[in-house]
Structures are given as C-alpha cells and as structure tokens.
From Swiss-Prot:
Family statement: Belongs to the YciB family.
Keywords of this entry: Cell inner membrane, Cell membrane, Membrane, Transmembrane, Transmembrane helix
Domain of life: Bacteria
The organism's taxonomic lineage, starting at the top: Bacteria, Pseudomonadati, Pseudomonadota, Betaproteobacteria, Burkholderiales
Protein known as: Inner membrane-spanning protein YciB
Gene Ontology cellular component list: plasma membrane
Places the protein is found: Cell inner membrane
Length: 206
C-alpha cells in the first residue's frame, strides 16, 4: 500500500499526460482555463497542454500526500519533503515558462540529491544511511555495508544520467513512459539483484 501511496503523483502525472495526448482540444481548453494565470504569457497551446496539466496535477498530488500525512499525524520522510521542494521549483518553472525541460530534470535532480546525501553522510558524518535503514533486516560486515552504500550512490547517479539521456534523445511521450515504467523497472531490478546477493545475510524471523 505504501508503494502505491509513494507512486501516487507519478501515476497521476502519467495518467493526465496520456489523457491530454488523446484529448488535445479538451486539454488545451482546460489548461487555458486553469493555468493561463500562471504561465508567463497567459497562453496554453495544444502541444503544451498535456505536460503542463500533468505537471500541475503532480504538484497538487505531492502537496496532498504531505497534507494527508500531517492530518493523520504520521511521520513525513525527509525524502518526501525533498521531492515536494524539487517538484514545486522545477514543476513551477515548467508551468510558468511553459518549458518541459525543467520537469524533465526533476527526476535527475532528485536522484542526485539522494546520491549526494548518501555520500556526504558516509564521508563527512561517518554515518552509513543504508545501514541505518536496513540493519534490522540483515547483519553485514562493515566493509559490505560500505560497498552497499556506494552501490546505491552509483545507482542513483546512473539513474540521473539515464533520465537525461531519455529526456534529450526521445520524445516527451517516451520520457513520460520511461518515468513510470522504465525508472520503476530499473529500481525493482536493482533491489531484486541486491536482495539475491545479500540473501545469505538476512536475519531469520524470531
């Protein structure tokens, strides 16, 4: 359930973009009605409407996520606050300047922030964040914890580069597909491969 909750803005982003692609006139009319006041020249074209509407919905969905958690009195992960800040800045720039380049950079910036946090904590704070999150599930030698942390740093750096490659080499529609299916698929594949390699260290349930 948490997995779907975390994916909520991404799924809505994908759904709204696909709707806009298939209903360009309706998307333009909707975008002109609700976004004309926040775009720089007050004009939402048919070609821009799908990505602008999808971006606006993703921003709203992320705000609603945090609002829901606050109302429920639940702890909000720092990663969610970071995601909110990045999508507000880059998504807001996309809408205001009606330029999809900004939102296409959003996943890369988020991935690289994760990588920087893991690396900074390990080098300067002498704290292994991956170990902090996973040590209740497995017992590893210090050297393996170190390499595991670095593997996640490398993964996030690589994901950021792959996102940029797709964003600049293919159409916006292809990038939107990759954002949901490609990015999530690579994440799942990495976690599964890592789990198989570390399975012998998993703690048995008491």
């Amino acid at each position: 359930m948490k997995f779907l909750f975390d994916l909520f803005p991404v799924i809505l982003f994908f759904g709204v973009f696909k709707w806009g692609e298939g209903n360009t006139e309706a998307a333009q009319a909707f975008g002109q009605q609700y976004l004309s006041g926040v775009v720089s020249d007050g004009l939402v074209t048919a070609s821009q409407a799908p990505i602008l509407l999808a971006t606006a919905v993703a921003i709203i969905a992320t705000v609603l996520q945090i609002g829901y958690l606050l109302v429920k009195g639940r702890k909000i992960d720092k990663t969610l606050w970071l995601s909110l800040g990045i999508i507000v800045v880059f998504g807001g720039a996309t809408i205001y300047f009606h330029n999809e380049t900004f939102i296409k950079w959003k996943p890369t910036v988020l991935y690289w922030c994760f990588a920087a946090a893991l690396l900074f904590s390990q080098i300067f704070l002498k704290k292994n964040l991956i170990r902090t999150m996973m040590e209740k599930q497995m017992s590893l030698p210090d050297g393996i914890w170190h390499r595991l942390n670095l593997s996640w740093v490398g993964f996030f750096l690589t994901m950021g580069l792959i996102n940029l490659y797709v964003a600049y080499s293919f159409s916006t529609a292809t990038w939107v597909n990759f954002k949901l299916f490609g990015g999530m698929g690579l994440m799942v594949a990495f976690i599964v491969a890592q789990s198989l390699l570390l399975s012998k260290y998993m703690k048995e349930p008491q």
